[in-house]
Amino acid sequence: MKIVLFPGRNLSTTAIAAACDAVAGYPQRLVQRIGHPVMWIGRLTDMLDRRLNRDTDSDPVRYRNGFVAMSIIATVPCATVALVQVFAFRRLPPPLAIIAGGILGSSLSAQRSLWEHVRAVSIAARQGLPQARAAVSHIVGRDPAQLDEAAVMRAAVETLAENFSDGIVAPLLWMSLGGPAGAVFYKSVNTADSMIGHRTPRHDRFGFAAAKLDDLVNLPASRLSAVWILLAAMTMADMDARGAWRILRRDAGHHRSPNAGWPEAAMAGALGVRLSGPRSYNGVVSHEPWVGDGRADLTPHDLDRALALYRRACMLQGGVLVALSVMLRRAWRARRPS
């Protein structure tokens, strides 16, 4: 049976996914009834961690089992969704299959969720420091009890920048390459890294493969996310696009992460503030270098500006996705014999 596909169908699917996520997000009722794709991947990761990462294993065995676990995590969910994609395009009209793929793919992006969680920190900050600490504790791993208002605002802006890359740009980029299956591949790797890719006695060796693969799959999206932030800053009068470019070139590589420094540096430069710096995790102070040249004493107003920049960057990304999918469709029509 011949399969007739729209050209640029992955781009069209991705554009629909981005729009659905921005408008509706992932409904809480679905979370309560069937869970979320990330939760399912998390269960698979947890099961493999319990079965393959035994305390009695030697270091070489833990390294090996970590690679085995990542092979399963990266391929099984992706292959399952890929089979569904093939079935959909065999059985459904291409436009309907693209729409269905976009709705499915929207669950793998976090535009609306990230906006709501970071916006909650801004709202809570107007009510008091305890409320702001409680709100930011939902989105950061550091100890909120040690944070003053400026540190809470920095933590929220840093989370916004970093998660714009790995929560939105990365899954949409992988979706544009491989459809929902591509996004599932990325989310599987990213979820595994968040669960087992830590430098702890239990996961330092078993999680090595997860951490390194996550760094690799996030490499293009982290750079692209910085581009979106830079372009968004160029369209906003109260942002410093030149500063974003300067700080991006100077500080992106100074971050502890090979990827997170890119969107964070672009965000810091555009806002004219300093991000990163020393922070405390479970009572242990981590002396991280500063990113940016401006003020470190951020206010709720700075967080609101960061949210506005984030929203503009998401809009630019969505507009480019739509434009590219339309251009590919028209180019394909022009090439078809009349």
Model-identified regions with their sequence ranges:
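Solvent-exposed interhelical
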Residues: 194
